[in-house]
C-alpha cells in the first residue's frame, strides 16, 4: 500500500548523526530497513549496485522497493503522461477556478484569531465615516502571504491586505491612507517620520506587521520572539500619537506580544493565509465575517517560558492556585507560569458562555461510556461561532500523564442570544495511552473533565472514574 520515502537527504544525514561511517553504509542501512525511495540524496543511485554485488543488500529487497514505486506511478497515471501535473492550462482552469478561490478566501477568514479587542477596535464598519492609516511592511506585501514551503505557488498572485481592504470598502466613507514605516527585518527608522505624519492625519491606525516567511518552518529558529527589526519601535511611536491602534500579524509561529498586549487596542493573528489572504483579512476586519479561529499553540509572555505547552507533564512542586507566590515551587520569579494567550484561545465580535455541564454517570467500566453535555450561549449582540472544548486529566497512571489533554471539540454557530447543547462521549479508547510496556490501553482510575472555551477555562469541571 504505497511506498516509503525519506525526507530530503534523510539517508545522507545518518552520517552526520554518526550512525554510520559513510554514505554507502547509510544506503545499505536504509535499504535493508525498508526505505524504497531516497529523496534527492543520490546515495541509492551511486552505491546500491555495488552493495548488491557485495551481498550487503539483496536483489529481492531492490525488486520490492522498485515494484512499490512503479505501482504508485501507474496509479498516478505517470506512465500515460509523465508530465500530467505540469500543465499550465490545468492550473489555470482547475486549481485557480473561481469556486476554489472563494473556498480559499473563506478558509483565510476562518483561520484568523482575534487575540485582543479593547474598545471594540474591530470590526471597522463600512458604515463609518473615518480615515484609516494603514502602516507597516505587511500592508502591501504579497510575497510572504503563502508562507514557507509554498511549493510552486505564485507568490505575486496573492492578494495583499491593501488590495483586500480597498476592494472591500470601495464606495464607502471609509478612506485609507498608507505609509510603509519600516521594512520587515532591519532596524532602519528613516521612514518613521512619514508613518507618524500619516497616522496623525487619520482617525484610527491599523498596523500590519510580522515576519519574513523564511523565518518560519524548517531550520528557522529564533532566540528572540518579538517583532523583528524596527517594527515594535514603530508601533511604540504610533502609540504616542494617541490614535486608536490596531495590529494585524502575518507570521508562522507564536510571538512575544507582551508589549503589544498591554498597549495596542486590537490584535488579529492572521498567519500566512495564502493566495486570498487580503480578502480573508478584509472580511474579518470589516465584520463581514466574525472571527472564530482558535490558537493551536500557546503564546508565551517571554522566551524564558519556552517550551510552553498546555499538555505538559506535572511537576513535583506544583504552584498552589490560591497562593501563586509560594516559595520553593515550580514557578518563575518575574512572570506568571501561564501563557499570554493559551492553547484553544480566541475572541469573537460577540461573547459566549458555557454552563450547565453534566455527566450522565460518574463512573463506567470497560466497554461502557459516559456522555458529557453542556450548554453554550451567545451572550452578545451579533451572530457568531465558537469552539467548545473538552479537556481531561488522568489523575494517576503507571506512566506520568499530562496535566490536561484536549479530548473533544465542537464548533458551534449561534445567533445572538441563542443557546445550544453540545455533547461529548468518553469511552475507554479516549482514555488510552502508551504504558511502560509500549502497549496502548486505558487504566482504571479517577479523572477530571472540563468543558470550556480554551485550555485555561476551568469554570465547568467534574470528575468520573473508569473501573
Task: Report residues per predicted region.
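Secreted, periplasmic, or luminal enzymes acting at the cell surface/secretory milieu
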Residues: 19, 50-147, 153-162, 168, ...
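An anion/phosphate-binding loop that grips the pyrophosphate of nucleotide cofactors and donors
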Residues: 202
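Short acidic, flexible loop segments centered on an aromatic residue
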Residues: 381-398, 404-406
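Short glycine/proline/serine/threonine-rich loop/turn segments at secondary-structure transition edges
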Residues: 430-446
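A short helix->loop->beta-strand "cap" motif at the edges of active sites that frequently abuts
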Residues: 2, 174, 241-245, 264
Amino acid at each position: 500500500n504505497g511506498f516509503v520515502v525519506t525526507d530530503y537527504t534523510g539517508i545522507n544525514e545518518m552520517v552526520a548523526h554518526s550512525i554510520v561511517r559513510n554514505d554507502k553504509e547509510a544506503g545499505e542501512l536504509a535499504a535493508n530497513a525498508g526505505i524504497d525511495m531516497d529523496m534527492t540524496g543520490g546515495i541509492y543511485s551511486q552505491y546500491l549496485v555495488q552493495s548488491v554485488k557485495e551481498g550487503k543488500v539483496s536483489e529481492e529487497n531492490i525488486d520490492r522497493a522498485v515494484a512499490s514505486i512503479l505501482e504508485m506511478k501507474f496509479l498516478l497515471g505517470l506512465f500515460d503522461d509523465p508530465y500530467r501535473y505540469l500543465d499550465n492550462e490545468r492550473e489555470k482552469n482547475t486549481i485557480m477556478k473561481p469556486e476554489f478561490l472563494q473556498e480559499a478566501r473563506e478558509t483565510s477568514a476562518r483561520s484568523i484569531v482575534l487575540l485582543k479587542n479593547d474598545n471594540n477596535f474591530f470590526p471597522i464598519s463600512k458604515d463609518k465615516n473615518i480615515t484609516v492609516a494603514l502602516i507597516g511592511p505587511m500592508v502591501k506585501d504579497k510575497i510572504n502571504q503563502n508562507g514557507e514551503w509554498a511549493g510552486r505557488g505564485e507568490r505575486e498572485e496573492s492578494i495583499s491586505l491593501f488590495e483586500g481592504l480597498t476592494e472591500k470598502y470601495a464606495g464607502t466613507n471609509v478612506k485609507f491612507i498608507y505609509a510603509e514605516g519600516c521594512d520587515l527585518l532591519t532596524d532602519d527608522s528613516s521612514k518613521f517620520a512619514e508613518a507618524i505624519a500619516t497616522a496623525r492625519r487619520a482617525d484610527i491606525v491599523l498596523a500590519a506587521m510580522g515576519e519574513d516567511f523564511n523565518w518560519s518552518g524548517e531550520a528557522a529558529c529564533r532566540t528572540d520572539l518579538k517583532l523583528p527589526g524596527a517594527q515594535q519601535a514603530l508601533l511604540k511611536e504610533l502609540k504616542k500619537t494617541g490614535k486608536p491602534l490596531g495590529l494585524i500579524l502575518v507570521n508562522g509561529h507564536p510571538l512575544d506580544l507582551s508589549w503589544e498586549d498591554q498597549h495596542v487596542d486590537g490584535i488579529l493573528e492572521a498567519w500566512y493565509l495564502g493566495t486570498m489572504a487580503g480578502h480573508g483579512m478584509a472580511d474579518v476586519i470589516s465584520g463581514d465575517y466574525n472571527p472564530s479561529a482558535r490558537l493551536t499553540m500557546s503564546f508565551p509572555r517571554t522566551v524564558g517560558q519556552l517550551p510552553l505547552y498546555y499538555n505538559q507533564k506535572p511537576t513535583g512542586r506544583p504552584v498552589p492556585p490560591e497562593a501563586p507566590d509560594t516559595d520553593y515551587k515550580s514557578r518563575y520569579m518575574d512572570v506568571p507560569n501561564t501563557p499570554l494567550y493559551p492553547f484553544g484561545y480566541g475572541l469573537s465580535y460577540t461573547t459566549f458562555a458555557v454552563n450547565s455541564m453534566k455527566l450522565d454517570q460518574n463512573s463506567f467500566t470497560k466497554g461502557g461510556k459516559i456522555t458529557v453535555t453542556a450548554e453554550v450561549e451567545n451572550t452578545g449582540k451579533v451572530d457568531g461561532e465558537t469552539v467548545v472544548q473538552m479537556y481531561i486529566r488522568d489523575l494517576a497512571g503507571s506512566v506520568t500523564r499530562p496535566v490536561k489533554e484536549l479530548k473533544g471539540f465542537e464548533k458551534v454557530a449561534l445567533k445572538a442570544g441563542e443557546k445550544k447543547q453540545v455533547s461529548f462521549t468518553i469511552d475507554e479508547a479516549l482514555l488510552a495511552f502508551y504504558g511502560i510496556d509500549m502497549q496502548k490501553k486505558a487504566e482504571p482510575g479517577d479523572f477530571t473533565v472540563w468543558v470550556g472555551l480554551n485550555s485555561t477555562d476551568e469554570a465547568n469541571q467534574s470528575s468520573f472514574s473508569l473501573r
